[in-house]
Every structure is written in structure tokens, then in C-alpha cells.
Amino acid sequence: MKKEWMALAAVGAILPGAALAATAAEMQALADKSGCFSCHGMQSKLVGPGFAEVAARYKGDSQAAASLAKKIREGGKGAWGRIPMPPHGNLGEDDARKLAEWVLGGG
């Protein structure tokens, strides 16, 4: 009986990690499909800042996810230099929010 409980505990410990990995893969696929990687690298700047830079700049800002989601959908200029970020209005609000949270969480 003790072995069965230990096996269940091990499975329970593994499943949340598997769910997170699937979510990370889904978010990376959404970012790719949405064209994010045309301008942004995970760690480094391409045209726009790398996601790690974005996460570092907004760390501790409780409004960051909402403002970043808005910037994803509506575009922006001046926050990271002279090159504007084009709007992605075809991306739904929910997906924009998920992408923003993913970027802020370190991608």
C-alpha cells in the first residue's frame, strides 16, 4: 500500500510540470504564428527587445500584463527606441493577454 501511495505522489508531482511544458509549447507556437519572432528573440534583441528584456523592465509592475497586451494588439512607439511596434489587432484579447503573461513570466 505504501508503494502505491508513493507512486501516486510521484505522478502527482510530475503532472503539473507536464502541464506547464505543454502551455509553454502552446505559447511559443502562438507567438510564432502571430509573428512575434519576426522582431523579438527570446533573450536578445532582433528588431524589438528580447522577451527577457521586456520581462526585466516590467518586473514588479502589477499593470504590466494589461498594458503589454494592449500594446500587442494596438502597437506602440517610443518605449524601446525609434522603431514602432506594429499592431496585431487580429489577435484576440485573450490570446494577447496570454502572450503578455508568458513574456512577463520569462517566456
Model feature map: region roles:
Residues H40, R73, V103-L104:
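Protein kinase-like catalytic domain
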Residues M1-L8:
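Bacterial N-terminal signal peptides that target proteins for export
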Residues P16-A31, R57-K59:
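Electrostatic cytochrome c docking/interface patches
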Residues V47-Y58, R73-A100:
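Axial heme c-ligation environment in periplasmic c-type cytochrome domains
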Residues L8-G17:
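Bacterial N-terminal signal peptides
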Residues S34-M42, L99:
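The canonical Cys-X-X-Cys-His
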